[in-house]
Swiss-Prot record:
This is Nuclear poly(A) polymerase 1. Essential protein. Polymerase that creates the 3'-poly(A) tail of mRNA's. Also required for the endoribonucleolytic cleavage reaction at some polyadenylation sites. May acquire specificity through interaction with a cleavage and polyadenylation specificity factor (CPSF) at its C-terminus. It comes from Arabidopsis thaliana (Mouse-ear cress). The gene is PAPS1. GO terms for molecular function: ATP binding; metal ion binding; poly(A) RNA polymerase activity; RNA binding. One of its GO terms (cellular component) is nucleus. Disruption phenotype: Lethal. Binds 2 magnesium ions. Also active with manganese. It catalyses: RNA(n) + ATP = RNA(n)-3'-adenine ribonucleotide + diphosphate. GO terms for biological process: flower development; leaf development; mRNA processing; negative regulation of cell population proliferation; negative regulation of innate immune response; petal formation; RNA 3'-end processing. Expressed in stems, cotyledons, hypocotyls, radicle, leaves, and, to a lower extent, in roots (including primary and secondary roots as well as root tips) and flowers. In radicle, roots and leaves, mainly present in vascular tissues. Residues 480-555 are annotated as: Disordered.
Length: 713
C-alpha cells in the first residue's frame, strides 16, 4: 500500500495524526472484521451486482429516448435533435461502493435547458415510466426539498433526481466536478447536483479507497445496530458517516480498517463540538452561491455538530442534529472507544461492538406516536410527512422543558393486527444537572398540541390521516415492538451494555446512601390505581380520544421524576480538543473559557495506549452558541428560529490525546433511566366538536413531589 509520505500527497486540512503502517495484529483483526461484515450479509452477490449494472444501462436508455421525444415535440432543429442527450449519474452508497443487498440506487438525470423539471421530468418521463411493465411502485415527489421520483426497475429500487443545465446539448463526457456547471442553475438543480459532486469529492480526498470502503461499511452497520443512523430523526445519515470516516482516513492514511474504526471512536469521542469537520478548505467560489460560514451567516452558528460537505457550495450536512441526539451519539462513541480498547487486550470482539442497542430496555417511559391512513398510498405520504416533523416534537419538548431528554427511535413499527397503522417511539429521561423544586409541575399540553396542529396542517392532508400521541411505560410496551412480536421474559444479560449498567449500579450503591428509587417507583405506580395499563396495552383516556374518533384530541400525562446524578460542566472536562478547522475565527468573539466546574471524583479512565502526536493547528471554539433550531409553520407563522443558548465549556487544542474518561456523572451508560411517569384522569372534551389549539391541551405534567424523599430529605 502506497503511503502518503511516499507519494508526497497530503490529504485534509491538517497533517495526519499518525503515519504508522499496519502490524500483524492489525492484519488479523481487519480480516476478522471483513469476515464479520460478510457473515452478516453486507455484501451483494455477483449476480445482483450485474443486475444493477444492467438496470442502470436500461435507465440510461430510457432518459435518452425521453429527451429525443420532448426535443422533437418542441420543434428543435435537426442538428439539436440529433445531438439531444440526457445522462445518468450515480451517487450515495452505490457510488461510494458501500451499498448492500437490496439497497436503493441514488441516481441523477442531467438534461438540457429545454427539458424542464415540472413539465417534462414530472410530465413526459413520469408518463413513460408509468406505462412500462418493468417499472413498479412509481412515486413522484415533486415538492420535496430535492425533487425526485422513486420506483423499481426490474425489481431494483431507484431514486431519480433531475438537474436541468443551461446547455443545449449534454455531452457524454460531462464532468460534474467543475464549478462552472453550477452557473445559472436554479436552486433545485444545485441541490440535485450536490449529491454527485460531494460523493466524487470524498473519493478524491481519501488516501486509500478500499480501506475507506471497508471502514465505512463497518460504521454504517454499527450505526444502524446502535440506533443512530437516521438523518431525519436528528442523528446522522449516510453522507454524514461517509464524511466522518473520510476524515479519519485522512488522519491515519496508512492504517488498516481495524485501526480506522478504533480511531474513529477515539477522535470523535473527544471532539469539541461545535468545531466543524472539514475534508478540505472550503471554497468560497466565484458564482455567489451561499456557503456554510458562521462568521457571516448567523443561522450557521446554531449548528451544534457541523459536518461540512467538500464540494462547492459547501454546506452543513448534519443540521438536523439536536442537543439530545448529539449527547446520545457521544455516548455511543464513548462505548465504541471502550470496546475497541478492550479488543486490543482480547477482552471483547467485533460481536461486542455490534451488539444492538436495547432501546426498549433503556428507558422506563416512552412517548408513542400512532398514525393511520385510509389506504397504502395515503399512509406512505402521511408517514413521510410525520417523520419529517417528529424532530420538531423532540426539540419543542426539550426547549420548553429543559429537564427532559428525548431519545427518538429512528424507525417506525407496524402492528400486523392493525393494517394501515404504524407507531413511533421516543424514550423519555430526566435531564441531568437541572435543579428542581419539590412538587413543581410543568404542563406541556400546548407543546404536544402545537406539534399535532403543525402535523395536521399538512397541505396534502385528507380525511383518514390521523395521529395520536400518548405516554406508555416500559412494562406496557406493545409486543409488536419486540423481535418476532414476542416480549422477552427478562432484560438482556451478558451484553456489554448490561454489564456496564450493573457495574455502574454496584459502584453507585457502594458509594451512596440507601437508594429510595424503588420505593419511589412503587409508590408512584400505586397512585395510578385503575389507570394502570393492562395486558400490555397503552393507556386510554376515554372513547372520545381514540385514534378513529378524535385523533386530534389530547392525551393527559403526568411525569414523576426522581433525582438523578447531576453532570457538571463538560462531559469530558480534562479532554483537550483535537479539532482542526480552516475557519479559526468563526466564533462570536474568538475567546475561550475554562471549565467552570471541577470534574467529578468518580471519573474512570479507560485509555491504555500511549498518546499520539497531533500536529494539528490550534483553533478557538465558539464561546456560547450551542443552540437548537425550531421551525414553525402554518398557523404559527412563517419559519421561526428559536434558540436555546447555554454556556459551552471550551477547551483549546493540545498536542496529545489524553486518557479517556467516563461521562461526568460517572455513568458509562448515558441512557440509565430512573424516573416514572403516571397518568392523571381528566375531563374529556366534547367529541362532537373539534376543539381549538387553546382548548385541546393534553395535560402532560412533570411532578417532582418525590424529589425530597429520593434525596433523603
Amino acid at each position: 500500500m502506497a503511503s502518503v509520505q511516499q507519494n508526497g500527497q497530503r490529504f485534509g486540512v491538517s497533517e495526519p495524526i499518525s503515519m504508522g503502517g499496519p502490524t500483524e495484529f492489525d492484519v488479523i483483526k481487519t480480516r476478522e472484521l471483513e469476515k464479520h461484515l460478510q457473515d452478516v450479509g453486507l455484501y451483494e452477490s455477483k449476480e445482483e451486482a450485474v443486475r444493477r449494472e444492467e438496470v442502470l444501462g436500461i435507465l440510461d436508455q430510457i432518459v435518452k429516448t425521453w429527451i429525443k421525444t420532448i426535443s422533437r415535440a418542441k420543434g428543435l432543429n435537426d442538428q439539436l435533435l440529433h445531438e439531444a442527450n440526457a445522462k445518468i449519474f450515480t451517487f450515495g452508497s452505490y457510488r461510494l461502493g458501500v451499498h448492500g443487498p437490496g439497497a436503493d440506487i441514488d441516481t441523477l438525470c442531467v438534461g438540457p435547458r429545454h427539458a424542464t423539471r415540472e413539465g417534462d421530468f414530472f410530465g413526459e418521463l413520469q408518463r413513460m415510466l408509468s406505462e412500462m411493465p418493468e417499472v413498479t411502485e412509481l412515486h413522484p415527489v415533486p415538492d420535496a426539498h430535492v425533487p425526485l421520483m422513486g420506483f423499481k426497475l426490474n425489481g431494483v429500487s431507484i431514486d431519480l433526481l433531475y438537474a436541468q443545465l443551461p446547455l443545449w446539448v449534454i455531452p457524454e463526457d460531462l464532468d460534474l466536478s467543475q464549478d462552472s456547471i453550477l452557473q445559472n442553475a436554479d436552486e433545485q438543480t444545485v441541490r440535485s447536483l450536490n449529491g454527485c459532486r460531494v460523493t466524487d469529492q470524498i473519493l478524491r480526498l481519501v488516501p486509500n479507497i478500499q480501506n475507506f470502503r471497508t471502514t465505512l461499511r463497518c460504521m454504517r452497520f454499527w450505526a444502524k445496530r446502535r440506533g443512530v443512523y437516521s438523518n431525519v430523526s436528528g442523528f446522522l445519515g449516510g453522507i454524514n458517516w461517509a464524511l466522518l470516516v473520510a476524515r479519519i482516513c485522512q488522519l491515519y492514511p496508512n492504517a488498516l480498517p481495524n485501526i480506522l474504526v478504533s480511531r474513529f471512536f477515539r477522535v470523535f469521542y473527544q471532539w469539541n463540538w461545535p468545531n466543524a469537520i472539514f475534508l478540505c478548505s472550503p471554497d468560497e467560489g466565484s458564482l455567489g452561491l451561499q456557503v456554510w460560514d458562521p462568521r457571516i451567516n448567523p443561522k450557521d452558528r446554531l449548528h451544534i455538530m457541523p459536518i461540512i460537505t467538500p464540494a462547492y457550495p459547501c454546506m452543513n450536512s448534519s443540521y438536523n442534529v439536536s442537543e439530545s441526539t448529539l449527547r446520545i451519539m457521544k455516548g455511543e462513541f464513548q462505548r465504541g472507544n471502550e470496546i475497541c480498547e478492550a479488543m486490543e487486550s482480547n477482552k471483547a470482539d467485533w460481536d461486542t461492538l455490534f451488539e444492538p442497542f436495547a432501546f426498549f430496555e433503556a428507558y422506563k417511559n416512552y412517548l408513542q406516536i400512532d398514525i393511520s391512513a385510509a389506504n397504502v398510498d395515503d399512509l406512505r405520504k402521511w408517514k413521510g410527512w410525520v417523520e419529517s416533523r417528529l424532530r420538531q416534537l423532540t426539540l419543542k419538548i426539550e426547549r420548553h422543558f429543559k429537564m427532559l431528554h428525548c431519545h427518538p427511535h429512528p424507525h417506525d413499527f407496524q402492528d400486523t393486527s392493525r393494517p394501515l397503522h404504524c407507531s413511533y417511539f421516543m424514550g423519555l429521561q430526566r435531564k441531568q444537572g437541572v435543579p428542581a423544586a419539590e412538587g413543581e409541575q410543568f404542563d406541556i399540553r400546548r407543546t404536544v398540541e402545537e406539534f399535532k396542529h403543525t402535523v395536521n396542517a399538512y397541505t396534502l392532508w385528507i380525511p383518514g390521516m390521523e395521529i395520536s400521541v400518548g405516554h406508555i411505560k416500559r412494562r406496557s410496551l406493545p409486543n409488536f415492538v419486540f423481535p418476532g412480536g414476542v416480549r422477552p421474559s427478562h432484560t438482556s444479560k451478558g451484553t456489554w451494555d448490561s454489564n456496564r449498567r450493573s457495574e455502574h449500579r454496584n459502584s453507585s450503591t457502594s458509594s451512596a446512601p440507601a437508594a429510595t428509587t424503588t420505593t419511589t417507583e412503587m409508590s408512584s405506580e400505586s397512585k395510578a390505581g385503575s389507570n394502570s395499563p393492562v395486558d400490555g396495552k397503552k393507556r386510554k383516556w376515554g372513547d372520545s380520544e381514540t385514534l378513529t374518533d378524535q385523533p386530534r384530541n389530547s392525551k393527559h400525562i403526568a411525569v414523576s421524576v426522581p433525582v438523578e446524578n447531576c453532570e457538571g460542566g463538560s462531559p469530558n472536562p480534562s479532554v483537550g480538543s483535537i479539532c482542526s478547522s480552516p475557519m479559526k475565527d468563526y466564533c462570536t468573539n474568538g475567546k475561550s473559557e475554562p471549565i467552570s466546574k471541577d470534574p467529578p471524583e468518580n471519573v474512570v479512565a479507560f485509555s491504555k495506549d500511549p498518546p499520539e502526536s497531533l500536529p494539528i493547528e490550534k483553533i478557538a471554539t465558539p464561546q456560547a452558541h450551542e443552540t437548537e433550531e425550531l421551525e414553525e409553520s402554518f398557523d404559527f407563522g412563517n419559519q421561526v428560529i428559536e434558540q436555546i443558548s447555554h454556556k459551552v465549556a471550551v477547551l483549546s487544542a493540545t498536542a496529545t490525546i489524553p486518557p479517556f474518561e467516563a461521562t461526568s456523572n460517572g455513568s458509562p451508560f448515558p441512557y440509565e433511566a430512573v424516573e416514572e411517569l403516571e397518568v392523571l384522569p381528566t375531563r374529556q372534551p366534547d367529541a362532537a366538536h373539534r376543539p381549538s389549539v387553546q382548548q385541546r391541551k393534553p395535560i402532560i405534567k412533570l411532578s417532582f413531589t418525590s424529589l425530597g424523599k429520593t434525596n433523603g430529605k
